[in-house]
Amino acid sequence: MKKLKLYKFILAPVVLLSLQACFVAKDYEQPDVVKEEHYRTDTFPKDSLNMANVSWREIFTDPLLTGYIEEGLENNIDIRIAVQQVIAAEAYLKQGKLGYFPTLNTNAQITHQELSANSQFGSLFSSIDQYELSGSLSWEADIWGKIRSTKRAFQARYLQSKAAHQAVKTRLIADIASTYYQLLALDEQIRITEQTIENRRTSLETTSALKEAGNVTEVGVKQTEAQLYTAMAILVDLKKQERLLENFFAILLGEAPMQIERTDLAEQEITTQLHIGVPVQLLRNRPDVIAAEYNFVNAFELTNVARSEFYPSLTLTAAGGFQSLDIKELLDPNSLFATLVGGLAQPVFNGRRIRTAYEVSLAEQEQARLNFRQSILTASREVSDALYSYEAATEKIDIKQKEFDAYDTATEYSEELLNNGFANYLEVLTARENALNSRLDLINAHYNQLEAMVNLYQALGGGWQ
């Protein structure tokens, strides 16, 4: 009879292990959300090369800018928050890896019981002291793949946090570069405006002299004076933008607001050849797209976990240790005890908790799939936008340069004609105003080209290493 019981206990775990092959958990397959869509450009080559594989140090070569990027990657608050999210996800991953192992608990216990005189043993003992030193071991068979899916969900969550960390790095590099270039553009606009103010002060003196000579009226003097004040107001706005941008730039570096040292806009050159790669590379290079897919994997595996709750769970529990009424005999061989239990639990009625959890997991899985698809569409749009913006900015620089040259020449001619009495002052004022606006627009065009290059770098996945 004892042998029969022993065979039953040996057979139980063998059956449990053999049933583990009967998984109901589905294996993840990448959804059909990515198609070989084409970028809307004929200018850049679509081949295996991709500037996302190029380190940011090869794209942003300004020595001060590279130093700021390195400082930002080290100190930026968003980066440090992302690192902590990775650490938290890694802790869950370690937990998931141990899901197949049994749980072990130890227990040391002293029990004192006062007995009623009318109880079963009250006439023999007034009180009982019991001492126990024991341990218990519990193991659940992963028949339906719940533990495996939980482990994979934790793994996907960890990889998602890593990709999200990389996405924060790419965005930070782009933000630092873009803000730096914007500061350079403001420096140039401030320089031009200050130069314009000095020229208009000189023009005001000349106009006043012409009025004394009877060549212009008081109206001409006041219009020149008004143009001077217009330029001074523009300078105030530009310096305000400069201060606000410097404060924002300092925050990107993880620093308090401060003055930012920088070079000149004229020194900035685009030395890296722009390769956009092929559309499918977005899956490998865009960290936000990678994070979106891992989020979908996480939701998929959690749906497997929710589905497994419909099926019975098989557990094997063993307990043993020492138990005695006398502490002196606690470690005596006669105090040994042991228990081995195999259990099968099938959910029957639980207030629809399991079905609700499963339906919610299906809805969250579909949300994650749609977010993954949306991230692909957004990435394609951002690449197309950045490509066209770069092409347009490059073309506009040439046009704006010609426009400024024409206005500058017109200003020079009109002032000469005015001094010789062959032009009215309205022509001079118009030419000067157009020349200033055109020159400021030309600076913006140079900045827009650099900004488009930064956006293209980020849209393609950005070499954040």
Protein language model regions, located:
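Bacterial Sec-dependent N-terminal signal peptides
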Residues: M1-V34
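Short segments within alpha-helical structural elements
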Residues: R201, T230-M258, A306, K402-L460
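A small-residue-enriched
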Residues: C22-R40, E70-D142, A174, E242-I260, ...
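Periplasmic alpha-helical coiled-coil/stalk elements that build and connect Gram-negative outer-membrane
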Residues: F23, I147, A156, A163-V278, ...
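Sec/SRP-type N-terminal targeting helices
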Residues: R80-I81, K97-L98, A141-K169, V219, ...
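Regulatory alphaC helix of protein kinase catalytic domains
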Residues: T43-E71
